[in-house]
Design a protein with these regions (language model features):
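Membrane-proximal intracellular helices of multi-pass ion channels
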Residues: 1-484
Length: 484
């Protein structure tokens, strides 16, 4: 491995966090009486020094191997977690080491689960920092790095192919070295649009920027204890639904729609499949809520049904009601739709609707093959014919997802968590959704979780964000070196 390449590029990733820590300091100074000012200054100083250190003492190198790329991705995320927890840890309050780590990982992985029982106790600078970790993690700490690497660099091409899922390249066609800029342009466009809409709908500028950071990353952190419900506004509810959906759609499709001023990309079969899942689940959720009793009118049932289905399937985790007051069917449905999640090429976590669509198409192919053994059946996604070599890794990923869930649930039960809470929390963590059931529901907190369970959820959040494979690659590299 080329340690020079690894250290310099991981340093770049840390500087992205340092930049937003600096912005948090400005927020603290603007507030005037911010108790986290010292914590933010110390955190920024440490992160900036460590991030800039390789540029002073390590010579530049453009050679990058496959192994170097995996190490850059994994270390960029891990060190972002470590330095990202510093503001919480130094400020104190409810942030023990494990709680600070949980909050940081939840932020960067855009999960949105929290250990805080009173979010509104945090000073503005920490609230802004929480939302900033969503913004950084939504685009990806490695993507921030890629934005400053020349497009002609072979390093950029290799890292792009590692960090950007191959599924995300199926929805549209563009040169690989433009992929990162397309994602960044759409990401910033959604952020600015969400901020303006929230602000015009009645949020303060501070709340608007925090919720814009959160919604574009499909994260879920809010500045309020009751999440979106705090604003008690149907306009804000609808704005949130729209932007949660947009942030969960393939960014390439959104880019092409605006670039060509054509709605043709909306005929994408995966997008139609994803939208169909949302419609069916929303109808089921609304009917379930209405059947519970008079506390939910038809209007409330429909709004809650659509909002929470989009919130869960987009892996955002915003809420307008407490799922502990729902009928069991609605609560379980919320967990089930956390598995397929949004589309590849978006900021969502989970298995991705693309893989579920691919799996169903493959099952259909195999059924046809069983009925007509002599026929030649191919998996089509739109106009593209996928080979077995292209399909296989995605089916394996689905299997890996459920194996990871099974192992996590077993370990969580050992830590003292009940079976139903373990299943819900592990699916939520691995899919980067946030809310689960019970005390850890839509308006709850993971503060009561055992330390071991919190650590399990932290690992799940990380695995879900990087889609498992890079972690397995680094572990395999470590074992191969040890056995030499």
């Amino acid at each position: 491995m080329n340690l020079k390449v690894i250290s310099r590029n991981v340093g770049f990733a840390l500087l992205a966090s340092a930049f937003f820590m600096f912005l948090s300091i400005l927020v603290s100074l603007a507030e005037g009486n911010d108790s986290a000012l010292a914590a933010m200054i110390i955190s920024f100083t440490i992160t900036f020094i460590v991030g800039v250190f390789p540029f002073i003492f390590v010579r530049k190198s453009s050679n990058i191997t496959l192994k170097d790329g995996y190490m850059i991705i994994v270390l960029s995320w891990l060190l972002s977690f470590v330095f990202g927890m510093l503001p919480y840890l130094l400020w104190g309050g409810p942030f023990s080491v494990i709680n600070a780590l949980f909050e940081a990982v939840s932020g960067y992985t855009t999960t949105g689960a929290t250990i805080l029982t009173d979010v509104e106790q945090l000073p503005d600078s920490l609230l802004f920092w929480r939302s900033s970790t969503h913004f950084i993690g939504g685009l990806g700490v490695v993507v921030f790095l890629l934005l400053i690497i020349p497009s002609s660099s072979p390093m950029r091409l290799r890292l792009t192919n590692m960090e950007v899922s191959s599924l995300s390249k199926e929805g549209y066609r563009t040169r690989t070295n433009k992929t990162v800029w397309v994602f960044a342009a759409v990401y910033l466009g959604i952020t600015v649009s969400a901020f303006l809409c929230y602000w015009l709908a009645g949020m303060t500028a501070f709340d608007a920027i925090n919720h814009a950071f959160s919604v574009v990353a499909t994260g879920g952190f809010s500045t309020k204890n009751l999440s979106i419900a705090s604003f008690d506004s149907n306009a804000i509810n609808i704005i949130t639904i729209v932007f949660m959906f947009l942030a969960s759609v393939h960014f390439g499709l959104i880019f092409v729609v605006f670039a060509t001023r054509s709605l043709k990309p909306l005929k994408n079969p995966v997008l139609k499949f994803y939208a169909l899942m949302i419609v069916i689940a929303s109808v089921m959720m609304a009917i379930s809520l209405k059947m519970k009793g008079p506390e939910f009118s038809w209007g409330d049932s429909i709004m809650n049904g659509i909002f929470h289905v989009v919130s869960s399937i987009s892996t955002t985790g915003f809420a307008i009601s407490d799922n502990n007051t729902w009928p069991a069917f609605a609560a379980v449905l919320m967990i089930i739709i956390s598995v397929p999640c949004g589309m590849a090429g978006s900021t969502t976590g989970g298995v991705k609707a693309d893989r579920i669509y691919l799996m169903l198409k493959t099952i259909g192919q195999q059924v046809k093959k069983a009925l007509h053994p002599a026929s030649i059946n191919q998996v089509h996604v739109g106009n593209h014919i996928l080979t077995n070599e292209e399909v296989y890794p995605h089916l394996v990923y689905i299997a890996l997802y459920f194996v990871t869930i099974a192992i996590s649930v077993a370990l969580s039960i050992v830590s003292g968590v009940t079976i139903d809470a373990s299943v819900a929390a592990c699916i939520s963590a691995l899919s980067n959704v946030g809310p689960a059931l019970g005390d850890w529901g839509t308006l709850g907190s993971f503060n009561s979780a055992p330390v071991m369970a919190k650590f399990i959820f932290v690992v799940d959040m990380f695995l879900g964000r990087v889609e498992i494979y890079p972690i397995l690659a680094v572990v395999a590299m470590a074992f191969s070196r040890r056995n030499k």
